[in-house]
Each structure stands twice: as C-alpha cells, then as structure tokens.
Amino acid sequence: MQVLSSLKEAKLRHRDCQVVRRRGRIYVICKSNPRFKARQGGARNRRKG
C-alpha cells in the first residue's frame, strides 16, 4: 500500500479504483488489481512522555 499526500492520481489509475473513508483516513481500494491500493496521510502527533 502506498502512502500519498494526494489521492487524485491514485483514484484514476484503474477503472475499478474507488475512494473510501475508514477510521478518519481516506483510502483508494481496487479489488480487481490490489497493487493500486493507497492511503492518504500518515504522520500523526506522538505523545510526549
């Protein structure tokens, strides 16, 4: 799965790609060709402690 800052190109890679939102993150899933999976964002604030 790729982690991208923008999913605009990722959703246009294949005609079966679809954008879904799960747990506050945006994913591109493609059941017919799973190598096109992608997720937007990845950096989260870590706790100091």
Curated annotation (Swiss-Prot):
Pfam families: Ribosomal_L36. NCBIfam families: PRK00831.1 (NF002021), rpmJ_bact (TIGR01022). The lineage of its organism: Bacteria, Pseudomonadati, Pseudomonadota, Betaproteobacteria, Burkholderiales. Keywords: Ribonucleoprotein, Ribosomal protein. Belongs to the bacterial ribosomal protein bL36 family. It comes from Delftia acidovorans (strain DSM 14801 / SPH-1). InterPro entries: Ribosomal_bL36 (IPR000473), Ribosomal_bL36_sp (IPR035977), Ribosomal_L36_bact (IPR047621). This is Large ribosomal subunit protein bL36. GO terms for molecular function: structural constituent of ribosome. One of its GO terms (biological process) is translation. GO terms for cellular component: ribonucleoprotein complex; ribosome.
